[in-house]
Amino acid sequence: MSAARPQFSIDDAFELTLEDAGPEPESSGVARFGPLHFERRARFEVADEDKQSRLRYQNLENDEDGAQASPEPDGGVSTRDSGHMSVRSSQWSFSTISSSTQRSYNACCSWTQHPLIQKNRRVVLASFLLLLLGLVLILVGVGLEVAPSPGVSSAIFFVPGILLLVPGVYHVIFIYCAVKGRRGFQFFYLPYFEK
């Protein structure tokens, strides 16, 4: 009943045949759909590409001094250190761990060097001030609950503390995530930030 029809896959939806392409198809018979071109690749090509990207990442981890690295058949990485070859495994040495710790410490505080943070220093400081004042007022309220004082209610400190803490936490977290480039966080959404 049914002739041997080729199976349709999602990749076929992105390819234009000669009759779909219009008056000027490309010479290969498959027209490009705008700037994107989808083509099928064999599984071994994808696996080979994945292996190369892992080796590139491994080389970035292992080569702190910028030496050239090439993959070795046994899975290690060889580097050229002033003329002689040495093979290192992918395990980190103590010096690599300490230098990566130093880099992570610098990366932790590097968000303060962002140009928009420097330009809007007052807004950032006000956000931290809201956070700290809110924490202090809440802690004073907790202290009054633990050791009550006659004539002073802890609610006087809790309510303003929460009212200051919530926007302070929101702005500090939002600014930090925007500097780090997290998806959905942009300085454009903070009305007091000058762009």
Swiss-Prot record:
Pfam families: TMEM_230_134 (PF05915)
Keyword Phosphoprotein: yes
Ranges in the topological domain labelled Extracellular: 144-154
Residues recorded with modification Phosphoserine: 93
Acidic residues bias: start-end ranges: 14-23
Spans annotated as Disordered: 14-33, 48-84
Cytoplasmic side: 1-122, 176-195
Keywords for the protein's UniProt record, in alphabetical order: Cytoplasm, Membrane, Phosphoprotein, Transmembrane, Transmembrane helix
Cellular component, GO annotation: cytosol; membrane; perinuclear region of cytoplasm
Membrane topology reported for the UniProt record: Multi-pass membrane protein
Coiled-coil zones: none
Membrane-spanning parts: 123-143, 155-175
Localization: Membrane; Cytoplasm, Perinuclear region
UniProt-listed InterPro entries: TMEM134, TMEM_230/134
UniProt cross-references to PANTHER family, sorted A to Z: TRANSMEMBRANE PROTEIN 134
Family: Belongs to the TMEM134/TMEM230 family.
Name of the protein in question: Transmembrane protein 134
